[in-house]
Amino acid sequence: VTLNKLSHPRPADLDILLVSPDGTAVMLMSDAGGTAQPANLVSLTFDDSVSVSVPTPLGTGAWKPTDINTGPDTFPVPAPAGPYGATLSAFNGTPAAGTWSLYIFDDDPTGGGTGRLNAGWQLFLTPTL
C-alpha cells in the first residue's frame, strides 16, 4: 500500500486503516511519525517485508505497519470496529477482488491543523502460493 504525498502538521495524530473487500482490517499507522515536525508531501509505502517502523519525523520511504500506542483505536463510521490486524499478512487467504477502503482519521482534532492525501493511494497485491 502506498500513500502519495501525505501532508499533516502532526503526523502522530493520524490513524490509517486499510480494509479488504471481506472486512479484514489492518492498522497501517497509528500514533507514529511524531508531532514536532509536520509531514509535507511524504509518500509512504507499507510493506511487511520491511524491518523499519515508521520514523520520527515522518519521511518518505517504505515502512512496516506501525502502531505506537497499543491501546484501542476507534474510527468513526463507516470504518469497521476493531480489533485490527497489525501486519499486512492478515490479508493472506482473503479475496482480493472487490472494493478496498482506506480510512485516515485524525484522533486528536484539538492538536491543530488538518491534513491531506494530495495524490491518492495505490494498492499492490502479491498472491500467496
For each predicted feature, which ranges?
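Loop and turn regions of beta-sandwich accessory domains that flank beta-strands and are enriched
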Residues: 1-129
